[in-house]
């Protein structure tokens, strides 16, 4: 909630040692659930995200120490659409629509985290512009 420019609400479903599961509601009302499948202390985590009964995408967050006061964060997304049907048929829609929207979204999320860290206050909603999937 504090750094995500498109997140309206984030609720914990279950947060025990071996079971991390939460729900995100975006500004446009879209609700997704995240099931964390691996948690690597001081390195990052992997999760599956999607609507409650819908298709799931796989996401990996990784943190790398650069120096004492600097880290690098990477987010790798494997959208569910890439694993559906013919790769040849999916190639053009993915390249023309999904990939640019995904890059824009991730740039805003990372920008929100940077903004929050530098300003020590919540990132304003849609701070980096609206997003057609989540605003």
What are these regions (language model features)?
Residues 1-18, 134-135:
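Hydrophobic ligand-binding cavity/cleft-lining segments
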Residues 16-18, 41, 67:
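Residue-level recognition of beta-strand termini and adjacent short loop/turns
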Residues 20-27, 46-52:
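Short beta-strand segments that buttress and anchor functional surface loops
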Residues 23, 33, 44-46, 60-62, ...:
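Beta-strand secondary-structure signal
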Residues 27-31, 55-57:
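Short coil-to-beta-strand transition motifs
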Residues 123-135:
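Charge-rich (especially acidic), low-complexity segments
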């Amino acid at each position: 909630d504090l750094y995500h420019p498109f997140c309206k609400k984030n609720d914990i479903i279950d947060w025990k040692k071996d079971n991390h599961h939460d729900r995100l509601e975006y500004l446009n009302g879209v609700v997704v659930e995240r099931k964390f499948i691996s948690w690597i202390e001081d390195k990052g985590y992997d999760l599956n995200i999607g609507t409650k009964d819908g298709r799931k995408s796989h996401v990996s967050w990784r943190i790398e120490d650069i120096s004492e006061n600097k880290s690098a964060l990477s987010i790798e997304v494997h959208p569910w659409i890439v694993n559906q049907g013919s790769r040849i048929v999916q190639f053009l829609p993915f390249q023309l629509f999904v990939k640019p929207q995904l890059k824009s979204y991730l740039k805003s999320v990372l920008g929100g985290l940077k903004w929050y860290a530098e300003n020590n206050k919540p990132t304003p909603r849609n701070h980096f512009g609206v997003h057609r999937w989540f605003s």
